[in-house]
């Protein structure tokens, strides 16, 4: 799967991709299909905020969400064929009918 990072830019009023040169980029990772939302968030923060820091500031100064390839926030459940199931990578694949998973860490500093 691929992990990416989008940080909120006030002037764009949207989350914008962070390039590799600024600590983002598209990062290939191997995770168990049973990985849940909290575990995935922890992996993203560890990868993109080494030592709790980034080019945009400290981890504790920001709010975070996970988003799918359509920029929709990932919730604790996912709809698979009309059934609400707990989010994990396997259920996400089933819900979106994708083979190559791409998930984004969304970060924002409070105003």
Over which residues does each language-model region extend?
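Phospho-regulated scaffold assembly regions enriched in serine/threonine/proline and acidic residues
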Residues: 1-111
């Amino acid at each position: 799967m691929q992990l990416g990072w989008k940080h909120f830019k006030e002037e764009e009023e949207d989350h914008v991709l962070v390039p590799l040169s600024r600590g983002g980029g598209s990062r290939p990772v191997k995770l168990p299909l049973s990985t849940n939302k909290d575990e995935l968030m922890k992996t993203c923060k560890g990868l993109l905020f080494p030592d709790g820091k980034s080019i945009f500031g400290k981890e504790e100064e920001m709010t975070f969400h996970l988003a799918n390839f359509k920029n929709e926030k990932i919730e604790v459940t996912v709809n698979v064929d009309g059934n609400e199931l707990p989010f994990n990578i396997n259920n996400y694949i089933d819900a979106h009918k994708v083979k190559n998973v791409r998930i984004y860490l969304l970060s924002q500093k409070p105003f």
